[in-house]
């Protein structure tokens, strides 16, 4: 089995923490030197509880000697793991709506502080929903009426999410976008895979295997629609939180379902359309929601050669379990 890159993602924001302490940490927190011509090896951002430092940018030079600092980081250049693609935040419908309520001047200032690699924190990744999420105005997909001929980007995307993404990319064109659906269109759902009774609900259900290829083409249409707006989609996952039955918009997709969808629907649809967007599997918690038959979800899919050829890695959330699971998956 080929090792896969592991991509960790969290719904909401990624937190960047540089320093913390007790209530008197303004007296004890080490103060980094201000950037100098010699201190260019590392850029650090410092925040303390007294807010005397609030993501304050500073520079640091590598050294070979020992020191008494309690926050020393020791690097071994001979040992290398995966490359870090970046850090970022979720751009949901509600996030985009709230940003659009700001004045253009204030919004540009905020987005520059967040995404600019020259004048801000340099966030380099954003996560968005394919269709609705649990931070949307309501539940919807891009094709609520049966048949892909009815596919269209929803108002939440065209009026809020896409304009915000364009402003972000104007500030930092290198920002990467990863996306996931919270649910497939309801007309693609069944209550169970055994009986395949139609399931007219935004919450839970399964993707009807009869629609695996159709749903793969749905992804292609969505990616192409965003590309027409000048927004390249770096990666997708087949399903946000696939083991979560209870979200406002959700779809249960066990590892066997994900495997079969990828190798017979999503992967072939991408290949036929020439879509270069990466596919990450899983996109849920380290503990697999304590479902014994779903443990090691990604590696079970990797073991299938037909599915694995389309997969770039795995995505994880930090809501449950221990991040040491990433080491197990990497092995």
Language-model segments: residues:
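Bacterial Sec-dependent N-terminal signal peptides
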Residues: 16-38
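N-terminal zymogen propeptides
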Residues: 36-65
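Sec-dependent bacterial lipoprotein signal peptides
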Residues: 1-18
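N-terminal catalytic cores of secreted or lumenal carbohydrate-active enzymes
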Residues: 55-233, 264
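Surface-exposed molecular-recognition determinants
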Residues: 47-48, 172, 318
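Active-site neighborhood of glycoside hydrolase catalytic domains
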Residues: 214-235, 242-331
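A cross-family glycoside hydrolase active-site/sugar-binding cleft signature
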Residues: 90, 127-129, 178-180, 237-239, ...
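Flexible, active-site-proximal loop/turn residues at the rims of small-molecule/cofactor binding pockets
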Residues: 30-31, 132, 242, 320
């Amino acid at each position: 089995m080929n090792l896969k890159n592991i991509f960790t993602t969290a719904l909401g924001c990624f937190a960047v923490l540089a320093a913390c302490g007790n209530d008197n940490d303004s007296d004890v927190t080490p103060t980094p030197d201000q950037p100098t011509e010699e201190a260019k090896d590392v850029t650090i951002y410092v925040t303390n509880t007294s807010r005397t430092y609030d993501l304050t940018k500073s520079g640091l030079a590598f050294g070979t000697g020992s020191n008494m600092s309690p926050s020393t980081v020791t690097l071994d250049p001979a040992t290398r793991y995966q490359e870090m693609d970046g850090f970022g935040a979720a751009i949901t419908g509600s996030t985009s709506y709230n940003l659009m309520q700001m004045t253009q001047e204030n919004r540009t200032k905020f987005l520059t502080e967040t995404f600019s690699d020259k004048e801000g924190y340099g966030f380099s990744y954003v996560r968005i929903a394919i269709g609705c999420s649990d931070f949307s105005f309501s539940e919807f997909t891009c094709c609520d009426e049966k048949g892909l001929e009815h596919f269209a980007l929803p108002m939440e995307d065209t009026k809020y999410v896409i304009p915000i993404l364009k402003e972000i990319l104007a500030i930092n064109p290198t920002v990467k976008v990863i996306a996931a659906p919270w649910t497939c269109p309801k007309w693609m759902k069944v209550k169970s895979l055994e009986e395949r009774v139609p399931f007219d609900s935004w919450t839970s259900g399964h993707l009807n295997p009869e629609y695996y290829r159709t749903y793969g083409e749905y992804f292609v249409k969505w990616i192409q629609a965003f590309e027409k707006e000048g927004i390249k989609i770096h990666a997708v996952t087949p399903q946000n939180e696939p083991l979560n039955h209870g979200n406002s918009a959700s779809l249960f997709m066990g590892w066997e379902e994900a495997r079969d969808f990828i190798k017979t629907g999503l992967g072939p649809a991408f290949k036929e359309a020439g879509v270069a967007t990466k596919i990450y599997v899983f996109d849920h918690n380290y503990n697999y929601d304590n479902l014994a038959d779903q443990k090691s979800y990604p590696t079970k899919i990797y073991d299938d050669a037909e599915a694995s050829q389309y997969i770039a890695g795995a995505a994880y959330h930090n809501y449950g379990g221990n991040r040491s699971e990433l080491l197990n998956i990497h092995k």
